[in-house]
Amino acid sequence: MTNKKIVNSWNEWDPLKHVIVGRADDCCIPAPEPALDAKVPEDSGMKGKHGPRTKDSVDKANQLLNDFASLLEKRGIKVDRPVPLNHNQKVSTPDWEVESMFGCMPARDIILTVGNEMLEATMSYRCRSVSYTHLTLPTNREV
């Protein structure tokens, strides 16, 4: 028997069977980049700050994500969690470079399931340009 990846999402109202719930481990506040100007309010506590988030904020976010994953599992939904990755490292292309990645907490933002395909949703934040790579790995199993 071959181990094939099965993804099926043709509408928004069928029962949920399998989902990815992110992790807050090593999430970073994005360094200044063009997309942030329009999205970070002037009075935000993030304005002018970047780098790793505080341990307290990561712990609180992980508790919420863990509780959510547990709730889904109790309802019989298969839950995959991304493998933690050090997001406090540079990301670059020949055209640009940013000081750190964002994180893998909001998995739904970067993977769009249409039918039997998982599509990368384009991110305006450069720091999220490679976020999808480690999110798809745990889903390479039969549903």
Residues of each region from the PLM?
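N-terminal leader/transition segments
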Residues: M1-T93, E97
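General beta-strand structural signal in soluble alpha/beta enzymes
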Residues: D80-V83, E120-T122, R141
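Short, glycine/serine-rich, charged loops/turns that create anion-binding
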Residues: D25-D26, Y125, E142
